[in-house]
Regions:
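Nucleotide/pyrophosphate-binding catalytic subdomain
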Residues: 1-115
Length: 115
């Protein structure tokens, strides 16, 4: 089993990645794709009048501050546009892909960070 993480920064060519994924799947390789979408999320948040906010820890690590509205924007972009876009691209290449989010079946959960 291969777990492939596709980043979400600007400039990613999803068509090239999906071509490779389709080739692996058709060759019999079990595969899970995990994707990002931060660049698109930032753009959509700006368009909706809710620009991203970041906090920096004492050690210098920067994280996105996620309030309820930001979480809704994340859900719209990650679960909607990015996830279903990748599923569509895989389907057109003959891969019977299924798109899930961490909310589906509580696939993953994590503790909330203190800020």
């Amino acid at each position: 089993m291969i777990v492939l993480k596709i980043g979400g920064s600007e400039g990613i060519n999803y068509d090239f990645i999906v071509d490779d994924v389709a080739g692996l799947v058709k060759a019999g390789q079990p595969l899970i794709v995990v994707h990002g979408g931060s660049a698109l999320t930032n753009r959509v948040a700006e368009q909706l009048g809710h620009p991203p906010k970041f906090v920096t820890s004492v050690s210098g690590f920067s994280s996105r501050r996620t309030d309820r509205r930001t979480l809704e924007i994340f859900e719209m972009v990650y679960c909607g546009q990015v996830n279903k876009g990748l599923v569509e691209k895989l389907q057109t290449r003959g891969v019977n892909a299924v798109g899930l989010s961490g909310l589906d079946g509580r696939i993953w959960e994590g503790p909330r960070k203190d800020t």
